[in-house]
Amino acid sequence: MPRAPALLTNDARHQFTCCLCLHVRTGTIIFGITQIIIQLVFISFLFLMTFNPRLIPEDNHGNTDPSEDKIRFYVFSTLFRLVPAVSDIHESLTLPSPGTRNVNGNKLYLGHNVESETNFNYDIPPGYKDDVLVDVNNMSPSLVSYTQKNERGSHEVKIKHFSPYIAVCVTTFSLAFCCFMVHGAITKQPTHLLPFFFIQVFDLIICLIHILGFMSSTSDLRLMIHTKTGPIYIKSTGFTFIILSISCMMLAFKAYCLGMVWDCYKYLMLNRRGNLLDDWYSDQWGHLSTFWSLLRAGRNRGNNSIGNSGSPNEPNTRPRPEPITYDPANDLPKYEDILKIPANAYAPPPYYCSNINGNVNTTEASAVTTNTSNSATAANTTTTTTNTGTTTSVISTLTTTNKDDTQINSAPSNAHSSC
C-alpha cells in the first residue's frame, strides 16, 4: 500500500487513475460498455411497449386505482435515470392521451402535463402529525364529499401519457454517442469523447435541478406514494432523508463519471502531443490505492498546467540519455600535461557535419588536410628563407664588386693628379 503523502504528489502514476486502481482510459471503456448494455436493454423495453401498449404504466385509461400502475411507474422512472437525459427530455415533451377519459366519462384536457394525482384536501388528525395516512379506498363519506366539493364537480383526473417514440429517439442518440466514446477511447481519438461528455454535463445539471425542486416540494410528494391498496404510514423526515440520500448518491456518481471521461479526454490529448511515456502503466496492478485516492479520483487540480510540456512533473516520450558514469581514465588531464602538448598537435573541430555517422572520418580527413597544410607552409617558409638568404648574399657580392671597381677607377685619376 502506498503512503498517503505519495498520493498527494503530482506523480504521473496517480494523475490518471480512477476507481482505486484503474487507468482513466480503462475506466472510460468499461463505463461506455456498461452504458451501451443498459441502453440496449432499455431500447428493447421501449420497442416492446411500442408494439404492446398494455405495458405502458401510465396509460390506465381513466382508472383511478393507481396501486399497480404506480409501482411500474416508479420502476420505469428508476430505469430512466440510468440512461442520461432520457427521463428529463421525456418528461418535458410528453402529453396526455387525447382519448383518455376519467371515471365519469369527461374528456381530459391536453393542457395538463403533470403526473396522475387526485387533490385530497382533508385535514390530518393530530395523532398523525408526523405520519401521513394514505388510504383512498377506506376514506369516510364526509371526506369524499368534501373532496368532490373542492374539485367543483369536474372530477378531472390528470393522467400523463407515455410516449415511447420520443424515448426511443433520445436513447438512440445517446447510444450512438456512447459508441463514439468507446471508439474514441480505444483508438485514441479524444474528439469522439466530447458528444457523450456534453450529454453528461446536461444530465448532471438537470439532475441537480430535480434535487433542488424536490427539496422545495417535499410535502407534496409524500401524497404521491400509492404502492398498496391498504394504508401506508410514512415518516416524513425519514422519507425526505432517504430520497435526498439516493439523489445525492446518484448525483455524486454522475459527477464522478463526468470527471473520469474528462480526465480520459485530457490523457488522450497529452498522448497525441507526445508527452506521456506509455498508455498502460506496468505497475498499476501492483498496488491498491487508499481511500484518499477514491476521493480525489486521481485528478490533479493543482496550479500547474497539464498541457504545458515544459513542466518538470510531466513524463516525456523523448529518448532519455544513458547515465554518465565516472571513469578516472576518461577524466580531464592535468594542467602540466596540457602545457607539454604542442600547439598544432590536434586539428580544430569541423565547422559543420551533415552526416552524424561520419564525424570521425571527417575529423581525421580535416586533421590530415591541416597537417599537410602546415607542412606545406613550413616548406614555403624554408624556401622563402633560402631565397632571401641567397638574394642577400648576391646583393652583398655585387656591392663589394662595385666598391672594388670604384676603387680601381679612382686610382688612375689620383695618379694623374699627382703628376
Swiss-Prot record:
Gene Ontology annotations for the cellular component aspect, listed alphabetically: lysosomal membrane; plasma membrane
Annotated InterPro entries: LAPTM_transporter (IPR051115)
Summary of the protein's practical applications: Potential vaccine candidate molecule. Induces an immune response in mice and confers protection against S.mansoni infection.
Membrane topology type: Multi-pass membrane protein
UniProt entry keywords in alphabetical sequence: Cell membrane, Membrane, Phosphoprotein, Receptor, Transmembrane, Transmembrane helix
Extracellular side, ranges: 50-165, 215-240
TM annotation in the entry: 29-49, 166-186, 194-214, 241-261
Subcellular location: Cell membrane
Modification after translation, per record: Phosphorylated on tyrosine residues.
Stretches for region Disordered: 303-328
Record field: compositional bias (Low complexity): 303-316
Top-level taxon of origin: Eukaryota
Primary localization class, coarse: membrane
Cytoplasmic topological domain residue ranges: 1-28, 187-193, 262-419
Task of the protein: Cell surface receptor that binds to human complement C2a protein. This results in inhibition of the classical and lectin pathways of complement activation, probably due to interference with binding of C2a to C4b and interference with cleavage by C1 or MASP2 such that C3 convertase cannot be formed. This infers resistance to complement-mediated cell lysis, allowing parasite survival and infection.
Subunit and partners: Interacts (via N-terminal extracellular domain) with human C2a.
PANTHER family cross-referenced by the UniProt entry: LYSOSOMAL-ASSOCIATED TRANSMEMBRANE PROTEIN
UniProt name for this protein: Tetraspanning orphan receptor
Organism: Schistosoma mansoni
Lineage: Eukaryota, Metazoa, Spiralia, Lophotrochozoa, Platyhelminthes
